[in-house]
Amino acid sequence: MRVVLLCRYDGSGYHGFQIQPNNNTVQEEIEKALKKINKKDIRVYMSGRTDSGVHAYGQVLHFDTELNIPNEAWKKALNANLPADIRIFGVTTSNEDFHVRYNSTRKTYHYKLYIGQNVDPFLLNYVGQHKYNFNFEKAKKTLNYFIGEHDFSSFCSKNSSVEDKIREIMFSYRSEEHTSELQSPAMI
């Protein structure tokens, strides 16, 4: 049976998603949880990798298993065996023709940049910081060079099984202003 997961994680304490020797990774934690449930090693496949310290709001994964467990029970069992910074939010099954990497049609990335000297400590792990004046117009103009279809062959390994290396990059921009004003209830 092929089980498909929707996973969310805070990557602050991990060296990326993919297993690496001598480094703690998200994939390693998920595979350890699956081993506890399945009583044997289970390989997890991902739709894409994240780098060290990067978070995921909707990473799609799959694995194959002989266990026939209801979807909600998979979710409950996995979350019970995963660290609190990795959560499974959705579970479904699929036929064996589906592969998260090869059937993925889109990936969305969010980059958050805090402009200013005093970033809120609760945002530190979730934003990049630029301490001085930032030219938004120049940044948007530069990002326009990336928009459109591009050939990513030079980023693939020689043995890559991916046939179509053309990808389309789209861009959207949103600005939000945050206040550093402290709002806290009185403590007694």
Regions found by a protein language model. Give the residues of each.
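Structured-RNA-binding interfaces characteristic of tRNA pseudouridine synthases
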Residues: M1-S180, S184
